[in-house]
């Protein structure tokens, strides 16, 4: 099998990822579980050749120099793929994350109405958080798609690498890839403020400078979307504040309290009957939440989210209960992700 055939097999079987690892057969991840493909183990030189077939000269140089590299590529008519190539103890390895060619809508994802209300805001910061593989990129792509179809503005994305490719509809869209179109997130964000955007998507808030620039952009009339690998709204606020030196923390709390529109923390769970569905914790930046951020009372946020349903807020446990009630997930699956596991016994 060549790489195109392996990827076609992966897509046909609705796999989220294809794994190539020297010394082992190719494997695919389907509904969260890794499964072997029934073909012989691949040698190092085979995996190396499969990876090199789809790399540009620059990507090959990066791989040789740094022993790992990230990039994306597309097989027309099939899908786009986000690739990480690396080395391991048996030789070459690579993971291909499938990025569907078609962007799912907010309706497709079952997003609650508050998602649309949030992205109708003229400015502020919306954070989508969760572990790797929790569907953050899919949720953000649906938000960008909604804006693209319903608003007249300039959407600027900064990604590493570009995953979903958006075709300009009502909006002007410019998508920039780190290491190809810009040297880094902070450089691209600094430049973005002079590129007349209405909406800015930052693939990942990786460091102090990127977070600082994202807060500044949100304060100065832009709607900014970003991601973090945190698992809850409270942990997200802590992570952002903790990045800054002690002397700057009060100022950052003030900036964040003014600009934060929402934190959406998500997990991806197995659905009854196959497939996966997202479970969300949603914290909206209402005055009570802003005060808690400003006064460094993050521990009290959970109870505010619990009682804030009239504002579109919900805890992860509340959403898990709803998903179980609707028969979309099992109680054991909900219990695995729940904060209060007694709810699902």
Where are the predicted features?
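Short, flexible helix-loop junctions that flank or precede catalytic/ligand sites
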Residues: 1-345
